[in-house]
């Protein structure tokens, strides 16, 4: 047990934003729990790149797994300074096709995207309070504008935004809680969801909608998460859009 080293838990850390955030924290001296659900090999690769890190399997929809993930951090480092709730899931169903999305789909998406962050925060709360720790929830602009991969996903991220505000209010002053809201983020998750053939076309469509004319990388989202953890001591209860201006949109060509 090395209580002098700060420690962080990143859920859903085998790929994408979670992996990039794990690496970001490791380069700043954090010990990192790299949580994964299915991608053991990918998580092990991320943990190896992070140095003082461990990969821990767990489904955040299961409370016992959440408590085991928090326990792994305490066993290794004796403290939890930061929790990044990045694990997420969806059903890629066009919003025009209501009949394809059913109650079990909503239940699974909400179990991971809303109940998971709540259970992880609850499991880590006492340790976070001891060190004036930080929670960052990885939400989505979908939760504000009602777009995205499905009704279930957008609704779950809207709920996560509200959960962020509730936790920030009630865990203060010891713990800060914020959320980052990405838009389209390059990487495997969306590529697998929309299919290889459609990926570049969909990416271009989202870039055209964005005020900055581009989409984001996992590393750029990780930079924002890292700032909320290490560089924003008076920021709490905030929903930070990290979306290249997708939610803002672009003016009509005649207005530019």
Model regions: which residues?
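Active-site helix of classical SDR
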Residues: 121, 156, 164
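Short C-terminal tail/terminal secondary-structure segment
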Residues: 90, 95, 145, 226, ...
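Residue(s) in the substrate-gating loop at a strand-loop-helix junction
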Residues: 140
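C-terminal substrate-recognition "lid" of short-chain dehydrogenase/reductases
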Residues: 127, 214-242, 247
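Short, small/polar-rich loop/turn modules that mediate ligand/substrate recognition or access, typified
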Residues: 172-176, 235-237
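Alpha-helical segment proximal to the catalytic Tyr-Lys
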Residues: 126, 168-173
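Substrate-binding pocket helix/loop in short-chain dehydrogenase/reductase
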Residues: 94-98, 102-107, 206
């Amino acid at each position: 047990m090395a209580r002098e080293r700060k420690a962080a838990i990143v859920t859903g850390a085998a790929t994408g934003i979670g992996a990039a955030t794990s690496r970001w924290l490791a380069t700043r001296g954090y010990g990192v729990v790299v949580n994964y659900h299915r991608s053991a090999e990918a998580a092990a690769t991320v943990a190896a790149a992070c140095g003082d890190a461990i990969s821990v399997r767990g489904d955040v929809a299961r409370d016992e797994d959440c408590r085991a993930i928090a326990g792994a951090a305490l066993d290794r480092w004796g403290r939890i300074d930061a929790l990044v709730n990045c694990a997420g899931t969806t059903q890629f169903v066009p919003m025009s096709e209501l009949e394809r999305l059913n109650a079990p789909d909503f239940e699974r998406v909400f179990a991971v995207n809303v109940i998971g962050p709540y259970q992880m925060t609850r499991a880590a709360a006492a340790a976070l309070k001891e060190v004036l720790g930080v929670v960052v929830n990885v939400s989505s602009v979908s939760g504000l504008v009602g777009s995205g991969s499905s009704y279930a996903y957008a609704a779950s991220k809207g709920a996560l935004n509200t959960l962020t505000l509730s936790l920030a209010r009630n865990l203060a002053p010891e713990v800060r809680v914020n959320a980052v809201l990405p838009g389209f983020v390059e990487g495997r998750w969306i590529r697998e969801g929309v299919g290889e053939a459609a990926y570049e076309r969909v990416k271009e469509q989202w870039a055209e909608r964005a005020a900055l004319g581009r989409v984001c990388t996992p590393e750029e989202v990780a930079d924002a998460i890292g700032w909320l953890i290490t560089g924003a001591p008076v920021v709490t209860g905030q929903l930070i859009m990290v979306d290249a201006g997708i939610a803002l949109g672009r003016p009509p060509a005649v207005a530019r």
